[in-house]
């Protein structure tokens, strides 16, 4: 089982209290706020912080926060709806591969500079590593995704028993789910670097999974716990 350093060690040497850092990171990824909005909101609490400092916290802490939350993840279903959508990074379109199960639970995501067979394979490998092997995959009309699945079945990366189908109607579920993520991205006013975009989107996906009830929060204080209490409990070693 993966071990984690005490939470105090994560914030050693920081000039700000860890509760402020956790609050800023969780709010930034959970709500339709820009970093400048957060500066004003935190300022109302008598704390002066710059928007660049908040963005630095997001990039520094989100990967570790996501790993710690993962300990409490509920299993996703085996019937996946897979699709990709476009977002802009430094003025260029990049591709966000995502999948949800038939209940709308987020399976995984993968940000790629290209929309091709290799990108689709990378997404599926990541999704299976982080969750489970699917029993069924519903795709859109993307030829690259269909080819990726065929080739992975031929090489044994995907079991031959995995059913594959193409249905725009069934994939409406994941397309609607894209909107929630993209609505959260919009106030951020664009990404300048690909790596920063990937980290930030991982935080947005984490926040969406929390909202969908994809974590065993009973171990973290239950339904009566506040968002701040849930985050503190989940991040504790």
Q: Where are the model-predicted features located?
A:
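Residue-level recognition of single "structural anchor" positions
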Residues: 1-237
């Amino acid at each position: 089982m993966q071990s984690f350093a005490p939470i105090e060690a994560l914030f050693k040497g920081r000039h700000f209290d860890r509760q402020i850092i956790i609050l800023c990171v969780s709010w930034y990824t959970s709500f339709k706020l820009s970093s400048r909005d957060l500066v004003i909101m935190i300022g109302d609490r008598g704390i002066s912080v710059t928007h660049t400092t908040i963005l630095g916290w997001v990039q520094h802490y989100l990967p570790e926060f996501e790993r710690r939350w993962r300990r409490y993840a509920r299993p996703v279903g085996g019937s996946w709806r897979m699709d990709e959508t476009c977002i802009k990074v430094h003025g260029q379109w990049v591709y966000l591969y995502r999948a949800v199960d038939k209940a709308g639970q987020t399976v995984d995501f993968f940000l790629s500079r290209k929309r091709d067979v290799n990108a689709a394979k990378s997404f599926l490998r990541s999704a299976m590593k982080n969750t489970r092997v699917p029993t069924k995959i519903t795709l859109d009309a993307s030829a690259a995704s269909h080819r990726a699945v065929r080739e992975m079945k031929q090489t044994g990366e995907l079991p031959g028993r995995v059913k594959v189908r193409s249905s725009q109607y069934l994939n409406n579920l994941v397309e609607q789910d894209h909107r929630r993520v993209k609505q959260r991205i919009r106030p951020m006013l664009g990404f300048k670097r690909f790596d920063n975009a990937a980290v930030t989107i991982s935080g947005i996906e984490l926040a969406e999974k929390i909202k969908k009830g994809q974590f065993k929060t009973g171990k973290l204080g239950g339904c009566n716990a506040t968002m701040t209490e849930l985050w503190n409990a989940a991040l504790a070693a």
